[in-house]
């Protein structure tokens, strides 16, 4: 079936094996091949252990599954944030080695180097659990460090935006706008509403005594305000501020100091350089660790299918696992076909059990919906819940 007509949702199922190696697979394909795309889910022979161990492990794996998906979602969300203007490139970065998610799932191969088959199911689940915890912790640390840089930069940039009443004045003033190094005189900055500009120019020199006549100079106009300088004696500044405020002229708390302004610009340049320095390694880390945790996630699914299959179908281990992608709009029909095909596996099942309150055994296994065959849903769209 054409992949273009698939739904993007995956069903991981297993059914009992039959006498011939491919009999169960052929039977599944004959019944569903025109309404789904099917791939073998190649789960190797794993160490079974005891029934009690399997029951306990089923619950542990359910929790591990939820944990892994949660960390993947956090990582993908953060990856998208870090890409900023390149958000559209998120999909091409969500790869496992050189495989996209769909290819990795539909052509799954157990990674024995990471998860040795000689280990028990319990040990394998612990290996994966530690891996998830490590990636989660590393993600928190790396995102904290990078976010601190971003927030510091954003805080500095916010000061350069907004109105003349609040924004940083460093880029709006020059040394020649001020009387500097005077024992008695000081130049101050005043924000004047545009509708009061004529009034300011007429009366600023008379707002208090000791204002230098002709000293007011327009620096810039933005939005509803104009920015002026005025020079006066230091000892009347407080008086001037109060009278100016009564006339709706706002004196900014600003003293021109070249070293302070230079230090501010240098600090921003340093922060920006550090952010750019951290960007590429962070992108690389996110890409690699997405691959690591997604791989771990699909191995958890494989463990769950294996454990549930042994609990359902018993020993010796003989089941056929499959990755099924329903065709668009065919999920209901596919479910019906699977029900007809495997109803004999559960004589009491006239249909799926949607409410499990009367089945504590199934609830204890973390099963939320029940079918005559082993079933887990897989969603690889991590952009939203």
UniProtKB/Swiss-Prot annotation:
GO terms for cellular component: vacuolar proton-transporting V-type ATPase, V1 domain. Signal peptide: none annotated. GO terms for molecular function: proton-transporting ATPase activity, rotational mechanism. It holds the Pfam family V-ATPase_C. Gene3D superfamilies: 3.30.70.100, subunit c (vma5p) of the yeast v-atpase, domain 2 (1.20.1460.10), Vacuolar atp synthase subunit c, domain 1 (3.30.70.1180). Belongs to the V-ATPase C subunit family. V-ATPase is a heteromultimeric enzyme made up of two complexes: the ATP-hydrolytic V1 complex and the proton translocation V0 complex. The V1 complex consists of three catalytic AB heterodimers that form a heterohexamer, three peripheral stalks each consisting of EG heterodimers, one central rotor including subunits D and F, and the regulatory subunits C and H. The proton translocation complex V0 consists of the proton transport subunit a, a ring of proteolipid subunits c9c'', rotary subunit d, subunits e and f, and the accessory subunits vah-19/Ac45 and vah-20/PRR. Subunit of the V1 complex of vacuolar(H+)-ATPase (V-ATPase), a multisubunit enzyme composed of a peripheral complex (V1) that hydrolyzes ATP and a membrane integral complex (V0) that translocates protons. V-ATPase is responsible for acidifying and maintaining the pH of intracellular compartments and in some cell types, is targeted to the plasma membrane, where it is responsible for acidifying the extracellular environment. Subunit C is necessary for the assembly of the catalytic sector of the enzyme and is likely to have a specific function in its catalytic activity. This is V-type proton ATPase subunit C.
